[in-house]
Amino acid sequence: MTKWLLLMVCLGIACQNIRGGVVRENSSGKNLTNTLNVIHKWKYLDYDFDNDERRQAAIQSGEYDRTKNYPLDVDQWHNKTFLAVIRYNGVPSSLNVVSDKTGNGGRLLQPYPDWSFAKYEDCSGIVSAHKIAIDEYERLWVLDSGLVNNTQPMCSPKLFAFDLNTSQLLKQVEIPHDVATTGKGELVSLTVQAMDSTNTMVYMVDNKNTLIIYQNADDSFHRLSSHTLNHNSDKMSDQQENLTLKEVDNKVYGMALSPVTHNLYYNSPSSENLYYVNTESLMKSENQGNDVQYERVQDVFDSQLTVKAVSKNGVLLFGLANNTLSCWNEHQSLDRQNIDVVARNEDTLQMVVSMKIKQNVPQSGRVNNTQRNEYLLALSDRNQNVLNNDLNLEHVNFQILGANVNDLIRNSRCANFDNQDNNHYNHNHNQARHSSKSDNQNNNQHNDQAHHSSKSNNRHNNND
């Protein structure tokens, strides 16, 4: 597989350089191996072709190859679980829902909203859904890279929005090439901030480490470049199963938006540093030039961060190397003593490639139903097998895991503080600046921010 395949299949987070950092045990002393429950699992991904004749025809034509299907992202709305599958030759549909039907590999996938969107010859369908996100207004946002095999641009990159109540397409926005400057659709991350149904911001990152901001109100795009988004290539090795990868490009992945502080957290896959920027400054950035302040937290994490998500109470949950999930509460200062481990499992947490926090408990699986306010949804795979393209189709290779957030952090350092508010957060946050480095001066010194606004040529309905 190519370097991009290695990078993108695991969302740029599989190439973790495990340097022997020690992740502390959970402060509660509880057993961490079973804190996450298995909701769905697959030996390989298969699809609901309606009948066996259709499946056999897809296999014979090369439309479907069970060894080429790798899930990249997961999200859930009521009883629908969405699964994004990166498009390689042999992937019949990139955007799917998990059906009630079961095949030999696991639950069958159904193209969403139907098979017509899985066809892309005329560029009206979805080529490769790299990231998906569901907002508070019951809309599914889909970032389509337009690439096949991660290298072949078939169509322009696009942003789709679907009404989940009707499964109707609300908007299909072509991302202009002068905004996605690579011209190859190499867009790799997606986060949505919906102030209301019209005033919605969509944050994306391209493979040149540039933040692209889409404003739903007027269908405009603009770019923000910063050296915090631009990391040099490192030589790094993944010691899991003796797998070694060298000279893999650093990219920005795993963005997470806090509903408490409105901070947008991000990091490069080989970095132990965490960066963040407040989205209020991003909203003003189009007109205010360099008035965007980026913060960097360094020397806090024992190993590299992977994907992450933030709860409604400000608990940042994130993956680390060594098969663990950890947490930090935004109401506390960001230092080592306030970070805790909430899950560890060498099998199910070998590599977490997607993480979401949802408001309703899934309809299947063993997730605790006693508190229905929030639960963690995580997608994991067998890292070394995916990277080496040698999946053992007799073993479980992909899993969707879940846990009630309150149960997950109970008795940990991240347990919610009901008597704390954002003022207390700001006080502690300011105290933590000794471990945070403001990059605003560096931005001005290096003149490394570039802005570009563009009105896109969109095809969309007027009811959005």
Swiss-Prot record:
Q: Where in the cell is it found?
A: Secreted
Induction per UniProt is: Unlike other major royal jelly proteins, not down-regulated by the ecdysteroid 20-hydroxyecdysone (ecdysterone or 20E).
Q: Where is the composition biased (Basic residues)?
A: 426-435
Q: In which tissues is it expressed?
A: Found in and secreted from the hypopharyngeal glands of the worker honey bee (at protein level); expression peaks at 4 days post eclosion. Expressed in the brains of adult worker bees peaking at 12 days post eclosion (at protein level). Expressed in the spermatheca of adult queen bees (at protein level); Expression levels are higher in mated queens than in virgin queens. Expression in the head of forager worker bees is lower than in the heads of nurse worker bees.
Q: Which residues are glycosylated?
A: 26, 31, 79, 149, 165, 242, 322, 368
> Which InterPro entries does the UniProt entry name for this protein?
6-blade_b-propeller_TolB-like (IPR011042), Royal_jelly/protein_yellow (IPR017996)
Query: What keywords are annotated for this sequence in UniProt?
Result: Glycoprotein, Secreted, Signal
List all membrane-crossing ranges.
none
Biased composition regions of type Low complexity, renumbered to the chain: 438-447
According to the record, the residues making up region (Disordered) are 419-464
Query: A cellular component term (GO) from this record?
Result: extracellular region
- Signal peptide coordinates: 1-15
UniProt lists the family membership as follows:
Belongs to the major royal jelly protein family.
Summarizing the function annotation, the protein's role is: Component of royal jelly, a substance produced in the hypopharyngeal gland containing proteins, free amino acids, fatty acids, sugars and other nutrients, which is fed to developing larvae by worker nurse bees. Major royal jelly proteins (MRJPs) are high in essential amino acids and probably have a nutritional function in larval food. All larvae are fed some royal jelly (also known as worker jelly) early in their development but it forms the principal source of nutrition for larvae destined to become queen bees.
Report the PANTHER family cross-referenced here. Answer: GH10609P-RELATED (PTHR10009:SF7), PROTEIN YELLOW-RELATED (PTHR10009)
Official protein name in the record: Major royal jelly protein 4
Q: Which organism is it from?
A: Apis mellifera (Honeybee)
